[in-house]
Amino acid sequence: YNAPKGKNSFQQSSVSYLLGDSIFLINRSIIMRPQDNQNDFFEVYDYKNDSILRSFYASNFPKELLEHHGRDQAFQKDIAISNDCKKMVIAYRFLNMISIVNIEKEEINNLFTDGNKLNWEQVIEGTPKPYYTKVHCNNAYIWAMAIEGEDPSTFRSRLDIFDWKGNYLCKAHLDKWVSSFSIDERNQTMYAVTADDMLGRYNIKELLDQLP
């Protein structure tokens, strides 16, 4: 692919998403471009016309964290796109933050899920705590798999559910440490892969009944 703008964006990206007919969301990752010392940068790219429709930063990390040599670990994240491709959610593995993004309006809402500020000092000190392993979403809700416990031997997972305004709706404590999951709302079931590679199935009817 040799279109000038698109080629440059794709070469610098870590992942891209198809939002619609020839429209891509491209993430210029901090990890892929460590020399940039920038926050997570996204571009909405029109493949047919080789044009950048809009661009935005999905985070606003302090300079101390951006320049820290161990930031590659700090910025590990999972991204999910809503069914209508208008919204995006980012859950960070070692930061107590979930970013909710309206892709069309370039509106970003950063939620601090453990305390009222970003815990970047833990990363600088070399003692990062894991917060999230995976995130899923639909047009109505965000499902984030959080980690509870002080060390791997005691880790257990907690399923946090938010709406797109960032309201914390409800949670469910699980008996295992879950690394990945999927939600089957029609059958009111969650399928999960545990940290020791076991497949589990959870009945989430009671949880779904709590949602507005």
Each predicted region: which residue ranges?
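Loop/turn-rich, solvent-exposed surfaces of beta-rich toroidal or solenoidal domains
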Residues: 124-162
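Beta-propeller blade signature
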Residues: 40-49, 155-168
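Surface-exposed loop and turn segments in beta-propeller and other repeat-based domains
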Residues: 1-15, 51-74, 107-127, 175-176
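Short, solvent-exposed loop/turn segments at conserved positions within beta-propeller repeat blades
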Residues: 34-40, 91-94, 151-155
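Hydrophobic beta-strand positions that form the internal "hydrophobic ladder"
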Residues: 30-31, 88, 142, 190
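Structural signature of eukaryotic scaffold interfaces centered on beta-propeller domains
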Residues: 14-28, 71-86, 91, 127-138, ...
